């Protein structure tokens, strides 16, 4: 109803649900069909936060566990930030985008995001890793119910040998546990099965392959979501949209 009031001709949703028959059936019964374009990555790694902290560390790969402790040994500290750190966060995000070749939102987006998610009744937290007064890396996570999700990460060009991103993830997991979460979603890896991922992560660096190499070390399990689904609200306009996409050669969206 809200989508119709806004003049939308179709509603696209990406439910936070595992790719299973019951989820697909429920969506189909509600009038949705599978949409060929996913906005968010369908596959992710979810880390169990059950047990003691030493149990969580023990489930990590040896190198990842070592890097967490190395960062601590090298004097890296992690503090909570807020919207007052928006400019600092954006500078780290910009450095990461330039280094890794991807696009980011304008600075105002992150400023508003931090204000809404980390202030007042927000469900999120900003973590900043520093050493000797230098900002090295940052992470934004959110916690809802029993699950926390890693949303954004950024790092400076220097100081990467101190492994600040490993300690950031660990501190975010500790924060999530303190907020009653028993799982931590690392949010986004290539949409491939585990055998393919393990066979290719050392040689591939395109897309999400680079982050898979980092995320796999935290000892989580691969999970695939049900993906994007669409419900046309105005069939004439929906068919016109599909026809226009076909004419422009964007067949994936017109399927």
Tell where the protein language model's regions lie, with residue ranges:
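A structural signal for well-ordered alpha-helical segments within the folded catalytic domains
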Residues: 87, 166-170, 209, 213
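Generic structural signal for secondary-structure transition and capping sites
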Residues: 8, 65, 76, 220-223
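A conserved beta-strand-loop-helix scaffold within acyl/acetyltransferase catalytic domains
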Residues: 15-162, 170, 174-178
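Divalent metal-dependent hydrolysis catalytic cores, especially in the metallo-beta-lactamase
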Residues: 7-15
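Conserved acyl-CoA
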Residues: 1-8, 167-183, 188-191
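Active-site/acyl-donor-binding loops of N-acyltransferases
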Residues: 30-54, 186-255
């Amino acid at each position: 109803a809200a989508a119709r009031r806004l003049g939308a001709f179709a509603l696209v949703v990406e439910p936070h649900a595992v790719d299973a028959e019951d989820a697909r059936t429920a969506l189909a019964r509600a009038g949705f069909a599978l949409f060929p374009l996913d906005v968010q990555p369908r596959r992710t790694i979810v880390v169990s936060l059950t047990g003691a902290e030493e149990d969580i560390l023990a489930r990590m790969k040896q190198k990842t566990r070592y890097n967490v402790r190395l960062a601590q040994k090298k004097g890296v500290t992690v503090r909570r930030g807020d919207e007052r750190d928006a400019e600092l966060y954006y500078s780290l995000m910009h450095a990461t985008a330039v280094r890794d070749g991807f696009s980011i939102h304008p600075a105002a987006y992150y400023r508003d995001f931090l204000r809404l998610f980390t202030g007042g009744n927000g469900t999120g937290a900003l973590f900043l890793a520093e050493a000797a007064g230098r900002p090295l890396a940052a992470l934004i996570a959110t916690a809802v119910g029993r699950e926390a999700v890693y949303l954004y990460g950024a790092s400076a060009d220097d100081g990467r040998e101190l492994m600040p991103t490993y300690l950031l993830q660990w501190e975010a997991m500790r924060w999530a546990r303190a907020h009653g979460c028993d799982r931590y979603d690392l949010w986004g890896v290539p949409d491939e099965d585990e055998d393919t991922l393990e066979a290719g992560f050392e040689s591939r660096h395109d897309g999400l392959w680079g982050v898979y190499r980092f995320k796999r070390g935290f000892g989580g399990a691969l999970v695939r979501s049900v993906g994007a689904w669409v419900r046309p609200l105005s069939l004439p306009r929906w068919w016109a949209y599909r026809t226009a996409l076909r004419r422009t050669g964007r067949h994936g969206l017109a399927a």
